[in-house]
A protein has these predicted regions:
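Active-site histidine-anchored catalytic micro-motif
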Residues: 26, 31-34, 40, 56, ...
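N-terminal glycine-/serine-/threonine-rich phosphate-binding loop
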Residues: 1-35
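Conserved small/polar residues in nucleotide/adenosyl-binding loops
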Residues: 155-157
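Ligand-binding beta-strand-loop-alpha-helix segment within the catalytic cores
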Residues: 48, 52-136
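N-terminal glycine-rich anion-binding loops that anchor highly charged ligand groups
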Residues: 4, 34-51
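Short, ordered loop/turn segments at secondary-structure junctions
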Residues: 10-12, 38-42, 59-61, 99-102, ...
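Short pre-catalytic strand/loop immediately N-terminal to key active-site residues, enriched for Gly-Thr
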Residues: 146-152
Length: 157
C-alpha cells in the first residue's frame, strides 16, 4: 500500500465547501486517504439548543459529562454521517466511524478541561483493513482515555 494521506476537515468545510470534497475525491483516486473531521460549530449549535452550557479555556472547549454526550451524538450521528454522504455524492467510497469504534483512538486527558484528550495511540490495523478494501475511513474526533472513558479528541495534523 502506498503512503497514506491524512486529511483534517473542519466543520465549516463539511457544510460549505463542496470544492474541497471534490479535491478529496481526486486525491482518494490516487492514494489511500484517511479523513478526520471536526464539528465544533455544530456541537455548539446543539449544546445551545439543548441548554447545555458551553465554556472555553484558552480556545479549547471545556467538556463535562453532559457536553460529551451531546458531542458524541452530534459528531457521530450528524457530522460524520453528513460528511460520508457528501463524499459518496462525489464518488468516494467512504466509511464513517469514530475514534472509539474498535478502540481506534487512545487519548490522554488534557488537565483542566474535562473530557478532552490528546490522541496518543492509533489502532492502525483497523484503518489498514478499511484502506485495503479500497474505502476511505472518515473518523469522528472521539477517543477513549486510559480509563476507557469517552473524550473529545484533539487531533493535530
Amino acid at each position: 500500500m502506498s503512503e497514506i494521506v491524512v486529511l483534517k476537515l473542519g466543520g465549516t468545510t463539511l457544510v460549505e465547501q463542496r470544492q474541497v470534497l471534490a479535491e478529496v475525491a481526486t486525491i482518494a483516486r490516487r492514494r489511500p486517504v484517511v479523513i478526520v473531521h471536526g464539528g465544533g460549530k455544530r456541537m455548539t449549535e446543539w449544546l445551545d439548543r439543548l441548554g447545555v452550557p458551553t465554556r472555553f479555556d484558552g480556545g479549547l472547549r471545556v467538556t463535562d459529562a453532559a457536553a460529551i454526550e451531546v458531542a458524541a451524538a452530534v459528531l457521530r450521528g450528524v457530522v460524520n454521517s453528513e460528511l460520508v454522504t457528501a463524499l459518496h455524492d462525489v464518488g468516494v467510497d467512504a466509511v464513517g466511524l469514530s475514534g472509539v469504534d474498535g478502540g481506534l483512538l487512545v487519548g490522554e486527558r488534557v488537565a483542566g478541561i474535562g473530557l478532552v484528550a490528546h490522541v496518543v495511540g492509533i489502532k492502525r490495523d483497523l484503518l489498514d483493513a478499511i484502506l485495503v478494501g479500497g474505502q476511505v475511513p472518515v473518523v469522528a474526533p472521539l477517543a477513549r482515555d486510559e480509563a476507557g472513558i469517552v473524550c473529545l479528541s484533539l487531533i493535530h495534523i
